[in-house]
């Protein structure tokens, strides 16, 4: 048994699970990276730790300072986890409609939360975070939606872990996009290793990648109101726009068939991965990402179709 000295040592190297109980063509394999196994419960633990270390190493914030961010919750949890380790305070701007559980976890880790109006979306939270940086001495707004550390984190960690786990035998990569960092970084790594890897980006109805108008959706953690600078169309070969109904249906099926407790963004990714599997030939390996678990969305009635 491994002995560790800080919980952040457990970030990364999460399991890759082959899904066995969904109906896919013979010889086609669907794998899921179980990012809820990170210590803070989501894929954003990777990013939070990298952002904190970058901020300190580059002098953007000094010891004892304040980290500020606009977040739906998971990035905030990851940042709070590592801010605690390095003696930094954390303030997060969160749009009103996001999961109560995630906000409670951020506060349990010592963070302060400022709510912004639901109708202002994530852009409203970003503007508030930028304002706070100008008002608070020795503070740094990490701005995950613009920060190149975001895609770099997953280029350096998630992509290589997947590649190594399957000895490079990856044919299709499927993942949702919220800030876009996970997708852009991982897809870039996989395309560099093998340009033939098909990269499939997943968004909810109400996101803009397929040319739709941005509007509210129940699927939490993915969906873009704007496209960040570090993402372009070379990162993805296909877009799946998934309804809330299909995302939440797959959340329930994952629990019933695989014993997996996944969030709605994972449900959307799973829906797209299974659709890709229907078209795939024998010998195809499809890899997707489950960013977090359902336990932080119980108040949002995740198993009743969401609110």
Curated annotation (Swiss-Prot):
What Pfam families does the annotation carry? PALP
Q: Which organism is it from?
A: Bacillus subtilis (strain 168)
Modification sites for N6-(pyridoxal phosphate)lysine: 44
Give this protein's Gene Ontology molecular function annotations.
Answer: cystathionine beta-synthase activity; cysteine synthase activity
- What's a GO biological-process term for it? positive regulation of cell population proliferation
Phenotypic effect of disruption: Grows very slowly with methionine as sole sulfur source.
Catalytic activity entry: O-acetyl-L-serine + L-homocysteine = L,L-cystathionine + acetate + H(+)
PROSITE patterns annotated for this entry?
CYS_SYNTHASE
Which terms are listed as keywords in the entry? Answer: Amino-acid biosynthesis, Cysteine biosynthesis, Pyridoxal phosphate, Transferase
Q: Does the keyword Amino-acid biosynthesis apply?
A: yes
**GO CC term, one of those recorded:** cytoplasm
Q: Which InterPro entries match?
A: Cys_Synth/Cystath_Beta-Synth, P-phosphate_BS, TrpB-like_PALP, TrpB-like_PALP_sf
Q: Report the superkingdom from the record.
A: Bacteria
Cofactor(s) named in the record? pyridoxal 5'-phosphate
Gene3D superfamilies for this protein: 3.40.50.1100
The record's section on CDD domains has: CBS_like (cd01561)
Q: What is the lineage of its organism?
A: Bacteria, Bacillati, Bacillota, Bacilli, Bacillales
* Protein's name according to its UniProt entry: O-acetylserine dependent cystathionine beta-synthase
Similarity comment: Belongs to the cysteine synthase/cystathionine beta-synthase family.
Role summary = Catalyzes the conversion of O-acetylserine and homocysteine to cystathionine.
E.C. number, please? Answer: 2.5.1.134
User: What turns on this gene?
Assistant: By methionine. Repressed by sulfate and cysteine.
* Keyword Endoplasmic reticulum carried by entry: no
Kindly list the positions annotated as binding pyridoxal 5'-phosphate.
Answer: 74, 178-182, 265
